[in-house]
Amino acid sequence: MPALHLFLPLCLTLALPAQESVRERELQTRIDKLEQRLAEIEAKLSLLAPITAPKAPENAPPAPSAVLKEAEPNPYRNTTFNATLDGYYAFNFNRPFDGNNQLRAFDQSHNSFSLNQAALVLERAPNLDAGRRFGGRLDLQFGQATQTLQGSRANENRPEIYRAIFQAYGTFIVPLGSGLQADFGKFASSLGYENNYTKDQMNYSRSYWFNYLPFYHFGFRNTYNFNSKLTAQYWLVNGSNQSEDFNGFKTQAFLLIAKPIKTVTWNATYYVGQEGRAPLADPGRFHVFDTYINWSPANGKWTAALEADYTINRNNTHEAPARVDGGAAYLQYQATPKFAFAGRFELLHDRAGIFSEKAQTLKEFTLTGTRTFADGFQAKLEYRRDFSNLPYFATGKRNQDTATLGLIWWFGGKTGAW
């Protein structure tokens, strides 16, 4: 019996490894079959995928995510809407009985609160960087200045229909060289150093030369920049202050704008046309030689300018020439960002009385203090003295003295000079 007890455990011990080996083989066989079956299924699916995948129709709308795109650019993004209000009070020490300050372009009223001009300016300039070659500008104007700037029936056939339009022109950049800018319409004249908007001027009142030379033209203005130092312009227009031509003759102007150094700008213009009304048997010519130079150092404290003008006019070829010549000098000191002081002196020889209706020599000097309260509000306090070599002004005097307070507001997206 003891021998039997030893034999049975030994047999069981030898049998267990044999049973485990059989089970492992069965499991491995089963795994191999499963892997083979899975491979067959994957092969069948790969063959069925091209057949069963739905085909999108050619004209099917894109997925919602594809519809989303960048918003369209704002068409008014580069358009500026601007406005200015320019009013004044002037006192003439001659106390003219008609309340009129003589030889003044804008500040014509004595001892009266007055509106020089209220203007709206809409502008969309060309932008080659944005791929836009066209643009335009519209200046609507109301107030006393319209009577000066628009002219009368002496030079306009129908002044009333253009009265409120100071400027209205379209622009196109011709793809020629650096870009030829062509403007068509009514635009402010660049003859003379001064321009229309008071906020951009050293003085409140305007010079004799601003008052005498053309205010505006209607026609073509072409500008070409040769480089950063030289620009040329050519005008083909109806004439001086003519929205509608009254003699059928087109006036031309040739301009050069040079910037030899950063602090100096020089303008030179030759302007020629016919200013006599048709019919004239042998019409003469009106010639203007105008030049001015501006100096402004980098520190921005000082600005100085000189202007010289010479004009000849003949209504008929064989009549004696009527000449007007002279010039002006300007100096401004920007004491602080808010305070500036400026002076102007000018001389005008009205040899045939074209400007003042009397052959005389006119001079004037002006002193102006400017206080800029903010970007958009400015006050100018000014003293001016006009004088002649002949008794010309009210009450038979040779001089006219005025004191003026001008208040100017402006706002809008346009930066720099208007």
Where are these regions (language model features)?
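N-terminal periplasmic/intermembrane-space "pro-region" immediately following the signal or transit peptide
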Residues: 16-104, 406, 411, 416-418
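Detector for outer-membrane/organellar transmembrane beta-barrel domains
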Residues: 227-231, 254-359, 363, 409
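Outer-membrane beta-barrel proteins
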Residues: 92-96, 145-150, 191-196, 243-246, ...
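Outer membrane beta-barrel
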Residues: 67-239, 246-253, 257-265, 330-333, ...
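Gram-negative outer-membrane beta-barrel domains
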Residues: 49, 55-58, 62-67, 301-304, ...
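Predominantly the C-terminal beta-signal and adjacent terminal strand-loop region
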Residues: 367-418
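Bacterial N-terminal signal peptides
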Residues: 5-15
